[in-house]
């Protein structure tokens, strides 16, 4: 999921 990839935000 995108949440995992962009967890830095």
Swiss-Prot record:
Its main location: secreted. It is found in: Secreted. Conversion of fibrinogen to fibrin is triggered by thrombin, which cleaves fibrinopeptides A and B from alpha and beta chains, and thus exposes the N-terminal polymerization sites responsible for the formation of the soft clot. Keywords: Adaptive immunity, Blood coagulation, Coiled coil, Disulfide bond, Hemostasis, Immunity, Innate immunity, Secreted. GO terms for biological process: adaptive immune response; blood coagulation; innate immune response. GO terms for cellular component: extracellular region. It comes from the Eukaryota. Cleaved by the protease thrombin to yield monomers which, together with fibrinogen alpha (FGA) and fibrinogen gamma (FGG), polymerize to form an insoluble fibrin matrix. Fibrin has a major function in hemostasis as one of the primary components of blood clots. In addition, functions during the early stages of wound repair to stabilize the lesion and guide cell migration during re-epithelialization. Was originally thought to be essential for platelet aggregation, based on in vitro studies using anticoagulated blood. A long coiled coil structure formed by 3 polypeptide chains connects the central nodule to the C-terminal domains (distal nodules). The long C-terminal ends of the alpha chains fold back, contributing a fourth strand to the coiled coil structure. Heterohexamer; disulfide linked. Contains 2 sets of 3 non-identical chains (alpha, beta and gamma). The 2 heterotrimers are in head to head conformation with the N-termini in a small central domain. This is Fibrinogen beta chain. It comes from Erythrocebus patas (Red guenon). The lineage of its organism: Eukaryota, Metazoa, Chordata, Craniata, Vertebrata.
């Amino acid at each position: 999921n995108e949440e995992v990839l962009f967890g830095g935000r």
